[in-house]
Amino acid sequence: MNAEAQGQKSGKSSPTKWIVAAIAVVLVVIAGIAIVGGGSDNGSSNDSADGGSQVTTPPDGSAASGGAGEFQPVTATGEALPMLEESVPAPGSDPAEGTAAPVLSGFDFDGAPVTLAPTGKPMLLVFLAHWCPHCNAEIPRLIEWKESDQMPDSLEVVGVTTGSRDDQPNWPPSQWLVDMEWPWAVMADSENQDAAYAMGVGGYPGLVLLDGDGTVLARRSGEASVSELNDWVAAALPSA
């Protein structure tokens, strides 16, 4: 999550810096992407998602759910992926491509276990924030992609609700996904966004495409049309 820098002189903000900040906001909106943690007013960083650090886990390698809830503990096993710096990286430019994604163990909103591990089939992880306008725009496209039979039959899709805030629109995320008619499995991220940080998600919606053995094929963030989703998956997964 990017922290805003405010310049001050004689108790007033610099007009030039206000203009720069306004331009930055416009560019983010045009890009169709919400910055990770955009629902918060406080800046934060992810020290564990620099690509060279190990995601920490409890001594027994597991986490226990406290029952039903909008936030659930997440255990990640493996190295965190580097933070995605571009919304749509050129093929081969994402340092995470070709590396093993960490295995995520967590729970759904009801407290039922959910494990995101290799299944032998390609998997698409979709990181969503309930307050994100781009996520709200993208979910209907993903559903259209599925219902129009353009999505590869072998592709498994899992939604991960993250960056949740009870002071933001569409709270709670569990009801939001019901209202949006989300048809796939769901993992609820922790309040610390452990799942998102482990996968190096830099914006919402964040998409992480994995091969059947858990290898990262491609990542992207921001809105995508059905045709763009088709092209993106086909380029990363030729057999799709």
Ranges and model annotations:
Residues 152-170, 182-191:
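Thiol-based oxidoreductase modules, predominantly thioredoxin-like and allied folds used
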Residues 121, 150, 203-240:
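Thiol-/selenol-based redox modules, centered on thioredoxin-like
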Residues 95-96, 103-123:
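A short beta-strand-turn-helix
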Residues 113-136, 142:
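Short active-site neighborhood of thiol/selenol oxidoreductases, capturing the structured segment around
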Residues 1-100:
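N-terminal targeting signals for export/organelle localization
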Residues 174-213:
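Short, internal strand/loop/helix patches
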Residues 129-134, 163-167, 191-194, 202, ...:
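Solvent-exposed loop/turn segments at secondary-structure junctions
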Residues 121-122, 137-161, 226-228, 234-235:
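Conserved helix-turn-beta segment immediately C-terminal to the redox Cys motif
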